[in-house]
Amino acid sequence: MRSDWIAPRRGQANVTQMHYARQGVITEEMDFVARRENLPADLIRDEVARGRMIIPANINHTNLEPMAIGIASKCKVNANIGASPNASNIDEEVEKLKLAVKYGADTVMDLSTGGGNLDEIRTAIINASPVPIGTVPVYQALESVHGRIEKLSADDFLHVIEKHCEQGVDYQTIHAGLLIEHLPKVKSRITGIVSRGGGIIAQWMLYHHKQNPLYTHFRDIIEIFKRYDCSFSLGDSLRPGCLHDASDDAQLSELKTLGQLTRVAWEHDVQVMVEGPGHVPMDQIEFNVRKQMEECSEAPFYVLGPLVTDIAPGYDHITSAIGAAMAGWYGTAMLCYVTPKEHLGLPNAEDVRNGLIAYKIAAHAADIARHRPGARDRDDELSRARYAFDWNKQFDLSLDPERAREYHDETLPADIYKTAEFCSMCGPKHCPMQTKITEEDLTELEKFLEKDSALA
């Protein structure tokens, strides 16, 4: 779809959406996003120019259907997929991608660390994906030196980062905010460092006693991203991995650095979003969102959850969707889904489905709470169908029509029950929605009440 849009830009020194927006240009991607979001195109351009919105759209991802992440647009949901050395393969990951897109993922991150040739897995995912693809390049950098962290060099990181850009990756998690002086701050934590990428960088710094190479070479990464329009997703290496560690000095020190890096990238017209926690008690979620906006000059916030309790392994799609809905309400731009398998293992297709639906609910609830124009239209339409006992329309309007139909069919599978004025909960005689109050009923009631009032 984008080949003709991109052709005139190829070979230019800076092809980012932010670069064009700051020149006053409304790109085809911005216009496409405006129509998807039902917002004015000049508003999209202005938000991208300001840095409050990103359109992750690598020039080499030509089959992408552009979307926006930002405070002015709908709250988005990311799904993580990826093969591991112990489970999954390229075909399974492409199927997970298709399932994620089917159930509403706005972006997908390929977090593959094994299970085959990582370049082939990534290429297959990008070629099959109409949504933006994100990656964490430090995983492949480590794989390129056979897991020997001490052998990693800055050039190894930069080589992998550029390779991902060449393949068409739309945004990359860059763990540049973790500084060597931050490491002592994790001493008082229960769970230390829980970011895989952050853990790799921390081990590298501890071995070499040198500053984070992604930080010292940040401007080199900027130069790479400019040529492809790859967006930064600045990784929060020190995100809290449990409630005890939330909002601590380690997390907030890194956040301050992430804000500084955001502004450096903006100086070169490179798009940025900032990643956030994690595990956060409900009473600290608003603080975390407000603090990120303050430190990072309102760059879009992209949070993992957050989980609001640590005691529910197997149900962390629920514990985190609670926090995600609150974070979205307070202004988070994108929510990274958590599956029921979180902390326990690699998610399968059903886990992806359950995690995504939980997060589509959270994002939609946030849009309603933020009074986004039209956010509640679908809810109202489904409610009217429910009141009219239009079961098929209810199914069609559901976030997961297959699951809604499946549950109805468990007790009332026959077609005749798809027009019945009851379900198996109340049965045919006790459903309160059978009580239809007409205009005529209300008119008669008003007359009675007026008469009764006069007599009193």
Swiss-Prot record:
Catalytic activity as recorded in UniProt: 5-amino-1-(5-phospho-beta-D-ribosyl)imidazole + S-adenosyl-L-methionine = 4-amino-2-methyl-5-(phosphooxymethyl)pyrimidine + CO + 5'-deoxyadenosine + formate + L-methionine + 3 H(+)
Q: What is its EC number?
A: 4.1.99.17
Q: Where does substrate bind?
A: 80, 109, 139, 175, 195-197, 236-239, 275, 302
Textual note on the cofactor: Binds 1 [4Fe-4S] cluster per subunit. The cluster is coordinated with 3 cysteines and an exchangeable S-adenosyl-L-methionine.
Please tell me where [4Fe-4S] cluster binds in this chain.
Answer: 423, 426, 431
Q: Does the keyword Zinc apply?
A: yes
Tell me the Gene3D superfamilies matching this sequence.
6.10.250.620, Radical SAM ThiC family, central domain (3.20.20.540)
Question: Binding of Zn(2+): at which residues?
Answer: 279, 343
Q: One GO CC term of this entry?
A: cytosol
- Keywords of the record: 4Fe-4S, Iron, Iron-sulfur, Lyase, Metal-binding, S-adenosyl-L-methionine, Thiamine biosynthesis, Zinc
Q: What is this protein called?
A: Phosphomethylpyrimidine synthase
Native species of this protein?
Synechococcus elongatus (strain ATCC 33912 / PCC 7942 / FACHB-805) (Anacystis nidulans R2)
Q: Which gene encodes it?
A: thiC
